[in-house]
Amino acid sequence: MVMLDTLANAMAAIKNAEMRGKGEAIIMPSSKLIANVLRILEKEGYIGGFEYIDDGRWGKFRVKLLGRINDIGVVKPRTPVSYRELAKMPEHLRKYLASRDVGLLILSTPQGVMTHREALKRKIGGIVIAYVY
């Protein structure tokens, strides 16, 4: 079986484990992008922590869940947004968040993976890859 979008599989694994009330989720295969997204989720308080497990193949992440995630997923198609668009928060981005100040959009920017709030502070745009609330 071919995995086309490992980030989408990781977000689905987290969402399914949260809905089932599990204390942890196993994400495989691992990647740098998934690690960066997990760091953001940990920093913002959505997950308790994560660890990398080297299994000799692709590696895995064990994610400790806190029960704070209501919805999580990837944004398809991955659309680029400029700083001006991000400041206005157009309708095609607003639909991924629960309300005005609830939730995060995760962007891939030239300065690394960050939340939409960090991108607004740094006045840069990027590609919207995921959302969480």
From Swiss-Prot:
Keyword rRNA-binding: yes
Cited SUPFAM superfamilies: Ribosomal protein S8 (SSF56047)
Classification via Gene3D superfamilies: 3.30.1370.30, 3.30.1490.10
An annotated GO cellular component: ribonucleoprotein complex
Top-level taxon of origin: Archaea
Alphabetic keyword roster: Ribonucleoprotein, Ribosomal protein, RNA-binding, rRNA-binding
GO biological process: translation
GO MF assignments: rRNA binding; structural constituent of ribosome
Subunit structure as annotated in this protein's UniProt entry: Part of the 30S ribosomal subunit.
Function field: One of the primary rRNA binding proteins, it binds directly to 16S rRNA central domain where it helps coordinate assembly of the platform of the 30S subunit.
Similarity field: Belongs to the universal ribosomal protein uS8 family.
PANTHER family registered for this protein in UniProt: 40S RIBOSOMAL PROTEIN S15A
Protein name: Small ribosomal subunit protein uS8
Organism from which the protein derives: Aeropyrum pernix (strain ATCC 700893 / DSM 11879 / JCM 9820 / NBRC 100138 / K1)
